[in-house]
UniProtKB/Swiss-Prot annotation:
GO terms for biological process: 'de novo' UMP biosynthetic process; pyrimidine nucleobase biosynthetic process. It comes from Clostridium tetani (strain Massachusetts / E88). This is Orotate phosphoribosyltransferase. Homodimer. Keywords: Glycosyltransferase, Magnesium, Pyrimidine biosynthesis, Transferase.
Length: 193
C-alpha cells in the first residue's frame, strides 16, 4: 500500500496539486497543506491513473450511479462513471442547500456512490447523502482522490480513496499558523464566512 501511496503522491506533486502554506479549508478548519485536486484533474491521463486505484477498490460493489457535489466531485464522478460504465450526475448548492438541478434525478431504490476530490470532514458528502436518502436512494459508499481526515473523524459510510494523506488541520482558535500571524489563503469552493 505504501508504494501505491507514494505513486499517487508523486503524481499529485508533479501536477502541483499538493500545496504548502496557511490555508482555510472548505470545512472551516486551517491547515499548513492543501490538496488542490483541480490541478490533477486538468490532466485526463493522470486523473485516469489516480482514480483507477479507487475503481479497483469499488468495482465489485453493487451500485447504479455515481453522484458528485459541485465543484470538486464533478470530474471525479465523471471519471469513475466512465471507467465503471455507470451514469454520473452532480449536485450543486442553491441558496446554500445541496440540490439536484439540470434535470438530474435519483430514482427511488437506486444505489449510489458519492464522489469527492478531497475528504477532510466529509461534510459535503454527508449533505449529498442526506439528499440521496431524501429522494429514496441508497448510499453505498463515498469515494475520493484524497482522504485527509483526522483520525477522530469517522463517516457512516465506507470511504474508498486513491491515497490517505495525514495532514494536520486545526480549528481557527487552535491554529499555530494564526498564532504566528500568518495570513491564510482560502482556496476551497464552499462559501465560508
Amino acid at each position: 500500500m505504501e508504494n501505491k501511496n507514494e505513486f499517487i503522491i508523486d503524481i499529485l506533486k508533479e501536477c502541483s496539486a499538493l500545496l504548502e502554506g496557511h490555508f482555510l479549508l472548505s470545512s472551516g478548519r486551517h491547515s499548513d497543506k492543501y490538496c488542490q485536486c483541480a490541478k490533477l484533474l486538468q490532466y485526463p491521463d493522470k486523473a485516469e491513473k489516480v482514480l483507477k486505484v479507487v475503481v479497483d477498490k469499488i468495482k465489485d460493489l453493487d451500485f447504479d450511479m455515481v453522484v458528485g457535489p459541485a465543484m470538486g466531485g464533478i470530474i471525479v464522478a465523471y471519471e469513475l462513471g466512465r471507467q465503471l460504465k455507470k451514469p454520473n450526475i452532480f449536485t450543486e448548492r442553491q441558496e446554500g442547500v445541496m440540490t439536484l438541478r439540470r434535470g438530474f434525478e435519483i430514482q427511488k431504490g437506486k444505489k449510489v456512490i458519492i464522489t469527492e476530490d478531497v475528504v477532510t470532514t466529509g461534510k459535503s458528502s454527508l449533505e449529498v447523502a442526506k439528499l440521496i436518502e431524501k429522494l429514496g436512494g441508497e448510499v453505498v459508499a463515498i469515494c475520493s482522490i484524497v482522504d485527509r481526515r483526522d483520525d477522530n473523524i469517522e463517516l457512516p459510510y465506507n470511504l474508498y480513496s486513491s491515497v490517505k494523506i495525514d495532514v494536520k488541520s486545526y480549528e481557527e482558535k487552535d491554529c499555530p499558523l494564526c498564532k504566528e500571524g500568518l495570513e491564510y489563503i482560502k482556496p476551497g469552493s464552499r462559501n465560508i464566512k
